[in-house]
């Protein structure tokens, strides 16, 4: 393996370190080392993701008003999701020959602006008209980033759960209101970072508790009020008098509980059942480095918001998972995927593909947009297996020999994610605005 290397990255011309194990991973998946630091690699993927925005805009096909994750001012074409998923149009009709006299990204940009995008990122959903970034779900309203859920309102990042409202990052739970980072909880109100608990109110960092109110840091306890043990009868009388069904009383109890929480030390990180990890909000993870909001991850680095189960052997992977392996510098991809590089919104069952956007149930794609159930395609054109395997290495070399330079002077060769200026979403509508906030003038 190569020794540790300190590199100057091209976005801000400062230094970042590439460790020997990083080089081993890059060699394994056959990509050159990155020229951007981890934070900027995350930033440029965030520019392609909008989490909680839906817009009323005309369908690019017939002008019918539709709800879409892409606003009316976006430069891309947008079809209503039901039509986009149908067989009434063919993304292969937009195919084009690869032109070795022009940069790859320039050609890809033209294809991206030509092929219609789906109005929303949903898959196998029922009664989820006012939801986005959802799969295998039913009855969602103004909720986003959910998989295997039912009866969800005003919530974000929910997995394998039912009857959830006003909650964030909720896993394998039922009947949860106003929750934050809870796992395997039932009948939970106002709880934060709790797991394996039943009938709890305003609890924080509690595991295996039942019938507790306003408690912090308890393990395997029952009938406690602000960390004080009481009898079952005393607890039931307290709950009856608390009247948390009243909004005014709810706010009063919530504020009192928050004040009580402040008396206790805060753990250095949130997470359970981890081995050899660094980051925060990690659960059931092993050998995970500098990653955040990951569930069931193994051998990961620089990964964020992989909360839907099982992600392995991946770097710079942002959002989704649900059985993913060997993913690099990609976002919003998941559900039985493997060996994806520089991809966006590719799901489900995608593999062995690079520089693909909005593709599903496909393999061996390079520089494709909107394909489903295809393989051995380049710029949406079909090739034989032999033709594909002969042409792709030539394109990668061409990307090195004739790189794309954006308006800011940043150079994009093979091994870089899509240029930031290609994003079809305005900056203030993206996830980047949440983490790297800019004013309107900026």
What does each model-identified segment do?
Residues 2-442:
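Long, distal/terminal scaffolding or interaction modules
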């Amino acid at each position: 393996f190569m020794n540790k290397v300190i590199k100057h990255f091209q976005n801000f011309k400062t230094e970042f370190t590439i460790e020997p194990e990083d080089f081993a991973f890059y060699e394994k998946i056959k990509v050159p080392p990155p020229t951007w630091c981890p934070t900027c690699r995350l930033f440029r993927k965030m520019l392609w993701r909008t989490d909680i925005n839906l817009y009323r805009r005309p369908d690019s096909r017939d002008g019918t008003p539709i709800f879409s994750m892409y606003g009316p001012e976006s430069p891309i074409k947008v079809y209503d999701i039901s039509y986009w998923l149908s067989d009434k149009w063919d993304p292969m009709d937009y195919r084009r020959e690869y032109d070795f006299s022009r940069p790859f990204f320039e050609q890809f940009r033209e294809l991206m602006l030509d092929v219609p995008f789906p109005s929303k990122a949903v898959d196998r959903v029922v009664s989820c008209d006012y939801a986005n970034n959802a799969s295998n779900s039913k009855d969602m309203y103004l909720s986003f980033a959910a998989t295997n859920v039912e009866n969800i309102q005003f919530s974000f990042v929910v997995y394998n759960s039912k009857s959830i409202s006003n909650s964030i990052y909720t896993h394998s739970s039922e009947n949860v209101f106003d929750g934050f980072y809870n796992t395997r909880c039932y009948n939970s109100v106002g709880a934060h970072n709790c797991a394996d608990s039943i009938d709890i109110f305003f609890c924080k960092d509690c595991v295996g508790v039942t019938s507790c109110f306003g408690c912090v840091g308890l393990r395997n306890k029952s009938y406690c009020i602000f960390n004080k043990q009481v009898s079952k009868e005393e607890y039931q009388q307290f709950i009856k008098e608390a009247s948390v069904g009243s909004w005014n009383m709810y706010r009063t109890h919530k504020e009192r509980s928050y004040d009580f929480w402040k008396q206790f030390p805060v753990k250095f990180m949130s997470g359970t059942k981890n081995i050899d990890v660094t980051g925060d909000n990690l659960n059931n993870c092993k050998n995970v480095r500098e990653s955040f909001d990951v569930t069931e991850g193994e051998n990961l680095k620089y990964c964020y918001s992989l909360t839907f189960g099982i992600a392995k052997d991946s770097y710079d992977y942002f959002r989704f998972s649900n059985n993913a392996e060997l993913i690099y510098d990609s976002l919003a991809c998941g559900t039985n995927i493997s060996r994806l590089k520089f991809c966006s919104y590719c799901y489900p069952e995608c593999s062995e593909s690079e520089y693909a956007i909005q593709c599903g149930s496909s393999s061996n794609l390079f520089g494709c947009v909107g394909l489903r159930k295809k393989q051995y395609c380049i710029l949406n054109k079909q090739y034989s297996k032999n033709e594909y395997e002969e042409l792709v290495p030539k394109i990668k070399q061409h990307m090195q020999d004739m790189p794309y330079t954006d308006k800011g002077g940043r150079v994009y060769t093979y091994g870089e994610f899509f240029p930031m200026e290609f994003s079809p979403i305005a900056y203030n509508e993206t996830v980047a605005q949440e983490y790297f906030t800019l004013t309107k003038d900026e």
